[in-house]
């Protein structure tokens, strides 16, 4: 067993190809264990409040409906663009974080502020690079028919009906959301790691395990806090991604709701959801998201640090 290093710390200098590869590994690992939860979460976000049973039974309602009407394989709908999304996003996020970390270190920002700023830039970069895969995944997951949609067909439909902007529908909102998420996640992660490092020598021996537990939970804590704060923005973005779909009326019993979004921007759609469905609708799927966030962020950070450790041997 090796001592876990913090290769994301201010001043760390890791080769670009190593951060790119390690980020891809961490993204693929995270995706492999969370795909079914991701599918349920997106289905919940895309369904207006009046379309489901009370909050406590929403997850089971969606899961039972999918198994009954679409089969068990439906939990992996959109898995190819989803996997490409995670790999691309993970590679871009960690490699750009390392790059910005290197170039912003000379500015002498306080360590916690440095992590927050670098995390924001990494979030913007990874969002832009991976966003078309996110749009494809959302539309493929929205398919509630037994037969899966062709990825190439969906790409052609988006290009034909919406052009290049169709692949970036809601991208500005996404950059805002992901920038906040990355800033909060990396900022919290580094704050906890720095706190643990600073208190390691002064902590009593019988309380060392508490510090170690906190240290190893840094990524998970950061992910949970970020998800709670930004989840409403993600819900609005999902609806923007789906509202212009060619298959809207076929895949959704609530096409009239989406029709009311036509011509609206991010803020207007958010206000429309609040007015017609209430604030709880913006948090539809939050329990699944948090359940997914814990393993995702843990595996993501652990996978990245582990991959970097072994790549440093070469």
Swiss-Prot record:
Solcar repeat boundaries on the chain: 14-103, 110-195, 210-310
Gene Ontology CC annotation, any one: mitochondrial inner membrane
Inducing stimuli: Expression is regulated by carbon source, with very low expression with succinate, acetate, ethanol or pyruvate as carbon source.
Gene3D superfamilies with a match to the protein in the record: Mitochondrial carrier domain
InterPro entries xref list: Mit_carrier, Mitochondrial_sb/sol_carrier, Mt_carrier_dom_sf
TM helices/strands, residue ranges: 14-30, 84-100, 116-136, 170-186, 217-233, 285-302
Mode of membrane association: Multi-pass membrane protein
Role description: Mitochondrial transporter that mediates uptake of thiamine pyrophosphate (ThPP) into mitochondria.
Protein name, per record: Mitochondrial thiamine pyrophosphate carrier 1
Organism: Saccharomyces cerevisiae (strain ATCC 204508 / S288c) (Baker's yeast)
